[in-house]
């Protein structure tokens, strides 16, 4: 702890950019490295989950990411469930962002588009298209709307439910209505639930005790796109937050006699090096935003915005352009080949090589790699 004033202390924490991996074992061939992981009954070949935003995930994007071994999470409260012509609406939004550099213009339009009511038929149709393609189907809902939307999603045939907000606790208390008790909610479902975000050890442990199959660390913090620090004074030191959640996972594993809850890191991961460091800190998988937004398959056409940017009264994000001109395919973003020397393409290839250089063959073992603070 560091004293920041008389009688007030704060904890020293670390960002991913402040740490480095330290190889200390025999190196291996990257061809011998496995990046596979399993969430409940569902196996994925790469530890990559798409952040649930309309800037990324359409049914087509989710299908392609699933085909490549990852998981695309549809935003159940986004534009896809509100507008039949979602492509035209997104194009309108991008046009506004390109014409007017002031972020408020595009955010205002985004709020207007989200003011349209959710259409269960549109949402169910989008889910069905993903399911029919044979890939794992996951949809995100907020804690506030989880009880209302989940029956619609279950009827459409989802495999995984993601209950996600900027900050999620085991119980969401509301004086004006019935609180959401995640433990009760999850126990009544037949599908696995991933919940988050959390920023600390205690909240992560509490979420694990609800029966969640996975816990999301962070809220998708993205330079130039998310503004939770400016609006709420809340930010996430991802290296520390991931390590704390991993410690909660170990504690819960001992507490239950072997139940393993997966940790998903969501925020401040832009390159393959940061992806590798997130895994090294204890994450089982990462949730990516801007790295995937540059792909040709992303719905946002090279633009990214978080779901919180559409909040009707307190937006906590803006539109950010991530790619100009010809955009790489999702295959190239994830698996290469890359002509970019800064780690923004061939993300999984970079992770494999980092693991191989450090002498590890699988993700769980790689969580034990040595780390140093480099500040």
From Swiss-Prot:
At the top level of its lineage, which domain of life is listed? Bacteria
Q: Which UniProt keywords apply?
A: NAD, Oxidoreductase
Q: Which GO terms describe its biological process?
A: GTP biosynthetic process
Report the Pfam families cross-referenced here: IMPDH
Which EC number(s) does the record attach to this protein?
A: 1.-.-.-
Q: Which GO terms describe its molecular function?
A: IMP dehydrogenase activity
Task: State the similarity comment.
Answer: Belongs to the IMPDH/GMPR family.
Record PANTHER family: INOSINE-5'-MONOPHOSPHATE DEHYDROGENASE, INOSINE-5-MONOPHOSPHATE DEHYDROGENASE RELATED
| Stated name of the protein | Uncharacterized oxidoreductase ML0388
């Amino acid at each position: 702890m560091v004293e920041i004033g008389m009688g007030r202390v704060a904890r020293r924490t670390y960002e991913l950019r402040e740490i480095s991996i330290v190889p200390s074992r025999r190196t291996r061939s990257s061809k011998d490295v496995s990046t596979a992981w399993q969430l409940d009954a569902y196996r994925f070949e790469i530890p990559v989950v798409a952040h649930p935003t309309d800037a990324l995930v359409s049914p087509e994007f989710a299908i392609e990411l699933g085909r490549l071994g990852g998981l695309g999470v549809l935003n159940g409260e986004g534009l896809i469930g509100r507008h039949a012509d979602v492509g035209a609406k997104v194009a309108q939004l991008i046009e506004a962002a390109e014409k007017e550099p002031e972020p408020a213009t595009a955010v205002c339009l985004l709020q207007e588009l989200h003011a349209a009511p959710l259409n269960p038929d549109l949402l169910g149709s989008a889910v069905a298209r993903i399911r029919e393609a044979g890939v794992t189907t996951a949809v995100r809902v907020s804690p506030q709307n989880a009880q209302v939307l989940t029956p619609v999603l279950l009827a459409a045939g989802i495999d995984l439910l993601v209950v996600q907000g900027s900050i999620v606790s085991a119980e969401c208390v509301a004086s004006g209505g019935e609180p959401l008790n995640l433990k009760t909610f999850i126990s009544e479902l037949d599908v696995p639930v991933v919940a988050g975000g959390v920023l600390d050890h205690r909240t992560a442990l509490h979420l694990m005790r609800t029966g969640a199959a996975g816990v999301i660390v962070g809220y998708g913090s993205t330079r130039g796109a998310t503004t939770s620090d400016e609006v709420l004074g809340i930010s996430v030191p991802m290296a520390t937050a991931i390590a704390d959640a991993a410690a909660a996972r170990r504690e819960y594993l001992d507490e239950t006699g072997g139940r393993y809850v997966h940790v998903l890191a969501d925020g401040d991961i832009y390159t393959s090096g940061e992806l590798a460091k997130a895994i090294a800190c204890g994450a089982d998988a990462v949730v990516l935003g801007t790295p995937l937004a540059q792909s040709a398959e992303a719905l946002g056409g090279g633009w990214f915005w978080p779901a919180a940017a559409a909040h009707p009264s307190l937006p906590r994000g803006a539109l950010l352009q991530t790619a100009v001109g010809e955009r790489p395919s999702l295959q190239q973003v994830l698996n290469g080949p890359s002509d970019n020397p800064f780690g923004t393409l061939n993300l999984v290839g970079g992770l494999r090589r980092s693991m191989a250089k450090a002498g590890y063959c699988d993700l769980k073992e790689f969580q034990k790699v040595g780390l140093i603070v480099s500040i």
